[in-house]
C-alpha cells in the first residue's frame, strides 16, 4: 500500500492512497459436497476443495478534510475499486476422497466501482464527539450475477455514531 498526506493549511488536509491487488495463493480445505440422487436423497461426499486465483482488487482513494471551526470537521473522499480485473469468474475445484473431480466456473463479471463518501464530526467537549456519514457507490455487480457466497456491496448508506475519549 502506498499513501501520502499533505496539510494545505492549519484547517485543511489532503490525502491519497493506493492499495495493490492481492497475490494470494489458491485457497484449499476440506469440504463436504452434498449430491442429491433421485430416490436415494442426499449423499454426502467428503473431499478437498480449492478456490483458484481468488484475489482482492486494487483500490485508489483520494480524500480531504476541512476543520470549519475548532469543533466541526467535514470530510470527503472518492474511491475507485478495480473489481473487473479480479472478479470475472470464481473457479472452484472439488476432489472427492472416494474419487472423481468436479470443476465449477461461477461467472461474476464485476465492474469497477466508484464510491463517494461524505462525513462530519462535531466535538461536543474534549471527551465527546458526534459523527455522521453517507456513502454513495456505483454497483459493481451486474444484474442477475449475484452469488450468495459473495456479499452484495451496498450502493447507498448512512451512518451515525459517537466517540468518548478516556
Residue ranges and their predicted role:
Residues 1-166:
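Outer-membrane beta-barrel porins/channels
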Amino acid at each position: 500500500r502506498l499513501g501520502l498526506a499533505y496539510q494545505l493549511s492549519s484547517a485543511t488536509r489532503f490525502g491519497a492512497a493506493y492499495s495493490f491487488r492481492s497475490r494470494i495463493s489458491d485457497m484449499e480445505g476440506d469440504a463436504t459436497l452434498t449430491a442429491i440422487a433421485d430416490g436415494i436423497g442426499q449423499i454426502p461426499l467428503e473431499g478437498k476443495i480449492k478456490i483458484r486465483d481468488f484475489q482482492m482488487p486494487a483500490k485508489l482513494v483520494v480524500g480531504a478534510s476541512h476543520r470549519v471551526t475548532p469543533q466541526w470537521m467535514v470530510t470527503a473522499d472518492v474511491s475507485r475499486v478495480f473489481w473487473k480485473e479480479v472478479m470475472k469468474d470464481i473457479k472452484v475445484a472439488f476432489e472427492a476422497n472416494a474419487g472423481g473431480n468436479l470443476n465449477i466456473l461461477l461467472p461474476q463479471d464485476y465492474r469497477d466501482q466508484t464510491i463517494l463518501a461524505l462525513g462530519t464530526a462535531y466535538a461536543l467537549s474534549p471527551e465527546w464527539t458526534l459523527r455522521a456519514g453517507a456513502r454513495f457507490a456505483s454497483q459493481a455487480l451486474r444484474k442477475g450475477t449475484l452469488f450468495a457466497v459473495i456479499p452484495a456491496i451496498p450502493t447507498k448508506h448512512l451512518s451515525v455514531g459517537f466517540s468518548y475519549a478516556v
